[in-house]
Amino acid sequence: MIIYPAVDIKDGRCVRLVQGEFDKVTVYSDNPVEMGLKWERMGAQYLHVVDLDGARTGQIQNTPIISEMAVKLGIPVQLGGGIRTVETIETLLCKGIHRVILGTSAVKNPELVKQALKTFEDSVVIGIDAKDGMVAIEGWAKTSEFTAIGFAKKMEELGAKTIIYTDISRDGMLAGPNLKAMEEMVKAVNIEVIASGGVRNIDDIRNLKNVGVSGVIVGKALYTGDLDLKEAIEVAK
């Protein structure tokens, strides 16, 4: 199981939101690249980066920082937030981003998913953000008509190999992950499930490992010091 430290970028800074609310922001660093390098030094095998401005506007906004990250970090970076076209995917992969995450665009534009998976294969990951079991879109501002599990199965049929499953109600709350929802998702699909949202301590890492997810994205708990990255990586092995 891989631990993915999360670096969320807003206005060029490394921040954390509570439940995706843009007015509930805590700034942790003015230098997201340095933050990524810090997690790498502590043993991270992979970095999870989100362009929050991009998620909100539908277009990548923090390109210079993201490009610098891809160049300076020795570990792979997966990026989400505002990726809505095949051209954007191609540009990001050319800049050295290892994997891109399609969220809102996967819901609104299944043709894009089909084309992206066909062209870029494993370099495309599907982000499924759920609110009460329903898929949420556009920076979590709206709920779609899809159930999270139904949508995951649809993405698997289209050829997706990995999904990132976020429980919005838990995100940034340090309330513990929704283990039941994660377990249901793992059992429902035959592809890799990366869990996101609510991780607060080492016990949550152990519990998620038992559920059978292939990876865990950790944000706030690393920044508050409630979770030690080295210990989390050790437990995840």
UniProtKB/Swiss-Prot annotation:
What reaction(s) does this enzyme catalyze? 1-(5-phospho-beta-D-ribosyl)-5-[(5-phospho-beta-D-ribosylamino)methylideneamino]imidazole-4-carboxamide = 5-[(5-phospho-1-deoxy-D-ribulos-1-ylimino)methylamino]-1-(5-phospho-beta-D-ribosyl)imidazole-4-carboxamide
* This protein's record includes keyword Lipoprotein: no
Main localization, broad class: cytoplasm
Q: Name one GO cellular component term.
A: cytoplasm
Q: Where in the cell is it found?
A: Cytoplasm
- Identify which residues the record assigns to the active site: D8, D129
One GO term (biological process): L-histidine biosynthetic process
Per the UniProt entry, the Enzyme Commission number(s) are 5.3.1.16
- InterPro entries the record matches: Aldolase_TIM, His_biosynth, HisA_bact_arch, Isoase_HisA-like, Isoase_HisA-like_bact, RibuloseP-bd_barrel
Top-rank EC class of the record's enzyme: isomerase
Domain of life (superkingdom): Bacteria
Q: Which pathway does the database say it acts in? A: Amino-acid biosynthesis; L-histidine biosynthesis; L-histidine from 5-phospho-alpha-D-ribose 1-diphosphate: step 4/9
Keywords assigned: Amino-acid biosynthesis, Cytoplasm, Histidine biosynthesis, Isomerase
Is GTP-binding given among the entry's keywords?
no
- Extract the GO molecular function terms from the UniProt entry: 1-(5-phosphoribosyl)-5-[(5-phosphoribosylamino)methylideneamino]imidazole-4-carboxamide isomerase activity
Classification via NCBIfam families: 1-(5-phosphoribosyl)-5-[(5-phosphoribosylamino)methylideneamino]imidazole-4-carboxamide isomerase, PRK13585.1
The family this protein is said to belong to: Belongs to the HisA/HisF family.
Q: What is this protein called?
A: 1-(5-phosphoribosyl)-5-[(5-phosphoribosylamino)methylideneamino] imidazole-4-carboxamide isomerase
Which organism is this protein's natural source?
Acetivibrio thermocellus (strain ATCC 27405 / DSM 1237 / JCM 9322 / NBRC 103400 / NCIMB 10682 / NRRL B-4536 / VPI 7372) (Clostridium thermocellum)
* High-level lineage: Bacteria, Bacillati, Bacillota, Clostridia, Eubacteriales
Q: Please name the gene that encodes this protein.
A: hisA
